[in-house]
């Protein structure tokens, strides 16, 4: 899994699936691209990627358990610019897939389950004696 570093472009997000540089997905219409270029000059590049059916941006601090969900609440309300500025002002440097978060959740569930099984085994063995 490759992380998205500062200064590197991700795919174009909310409100269409075109990309800033035509490599990822189809290129944006020129008018939109021009507007975007002007906006980027004001607030810096937008390097946010969305994944999954609910299109959550996961911002990562370096620890897999620190994934932060910024859900897309309706079209255009949470823009790439908003997510970028939030990430920038919170000093988060990477954006990753939600896979990291789900794996950590599964790990927690597994450890809890195993501890429970161990407890049951000890209880049964004590009861048999």
Curated annotation (Swiss-Prot):
One of its GO terms (cellular component) is membrane. It is found in: Membrane. It comes from the Eukaryota. The chain crosses the membrane at residues 109-128. Keywords: Glycoprotein, Membrane, Transmembrane, Transmembrane helix. Glycans are attached at residue 91. The keyword Transmembrane helix applies. Involved in K1 killer toxin resistance. This is Protein FYV12. It comes from Saccharomyces cerevisiae (strain ATCC 204508 / S288c).
């Amino acid at each position: 899994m490759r992380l998205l570093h500062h200064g590197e472009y991700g795919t174009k997000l909310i409100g269409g699936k075109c990309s800033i540089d035509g490599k990822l997905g189809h290129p944006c219409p020129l008018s939109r691209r021009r507007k975007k270029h002007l906006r980027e000059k004001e607030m810096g590049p937008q390097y946010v990627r969305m994944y999954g059916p609910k299109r959550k941006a996961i911002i990562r601090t370096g620890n897999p358990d620190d994934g932060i969900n910024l859900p897309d609440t309706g079209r255009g309300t949470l823009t790439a610019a908003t997510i970028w500025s939030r990430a920038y002002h919170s000093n988060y440097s990477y954006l990753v897939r939600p896979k990291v978060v789900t794996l950590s959740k599964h790990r927690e569930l597994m450890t809890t389950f195993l501890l429970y099984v161990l407890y049951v085994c000890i209880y049964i063995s004590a009861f048999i004696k």
